[in-house]
Amino acid sequence: MASAQITAAAAGTWTLGDLTVNRMGFGAMRLPQTGRALIADATPGDRDRAIAVLRRAVELGVNHVDTAAFYFSPLRSANELINTALAPYPDDLVIVTKVGPGRDPWGEWLPAARPDQLRGQVEENLRQLGRDHLDVVNLRRMPSMESLAEHFGALAELRDAGLIRHLGVSGVSPEQLAEAQAVAPVVCVQNRYGVGASPEAHAFVDACGKQGVAFVPFFAIAGQGGGAGATGAEHPEVLTVARDHGATAAQVRLAWTLQRGPHVLAIPGTGDPGHLADNVAAGALRLSPDELARLGVP
């Protein structure tokens, strides 16, 4: 599909707490490196190109950027790139960060943060982004976290102190979402989701919508590629629908995701200006009920 003149507004809007965002956003995980993300020996990406992509994203109407302090490669940090590219920040730009996981300066993974260590992670994001508060902070649940409530409570205290505006969770089950909601309001859930998801995952997306909680899928384009990006193999039905619309498989995957409900937000990431324009344009692609069913909508 043609991407000229299509902006992120084509996907519609959603409100995270009191912050209105276009449903087509941008994920910064892929900016610091070329190839697989979140590994110690990643190849640093081109800094000027990454900065240009971020600025172009905002020009195209993207006002929801997802990042984390642990998104970095040797020489490159997603937060630093965002700060350099976009500060002073537009008034409508919402930056969403994640805490819980951590990496040492060499890129190796550290044990999950304890509740008393979360303030340090929040302050690291504040420093790198050049902000005095964070718009939304997601607690990424890690297997070693015995109590989600204890960690979420620590973030709620930072929200009450004015360092955080709104809270979300990532990598959680419906039961864990309820556990967090018993502590403080949750504005978004960020989980892995896309074409081919399980019936349980579909049900969780629907449940979030009924509660007015945004659902923000990660790896919606990559499928089984995960952190390595999209793989060469593609779902046959995705390819068929893409051909029918003159679109790419990635655009079909994004459109399918967005049509799962008005509360679903997309955060595709890329370091390529052409792919950025294609991703944003996917917000204008409308699939028929038959096409949605063929791709797996229950």
Which role fits each region the language model picked out?
Residues 1-93:
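N-terminal binding-site loop/beta-alpha segment at the start of enzyme catalytic domains
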Residues 3-8, 142-298:
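Beta/alpha (TIM)-barrel catalytic core signal, keyed to glycine-rich beta->alpha loops juxtaposed to Asp/Glu
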Residues 18-20, 59, 83-94, 126-130, ...:
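Acidic (Asp/Glu)-rich catalytic clusters
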Residues 23, 64, 133-136, 166, ...:
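Residues at the N-termini of beta-strands
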Residues 32-48, 104-116, 140:
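Active-site mouth loops of central-metabolism enzymes
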Residues 43-57, 112-130, 173-178:
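Short, acidic/polar
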Residues 92-105:
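A short, structured active-site edge motif that brings together acidic residues
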Residues 126-144:
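Active-site groove signature of glycoside hydrolases
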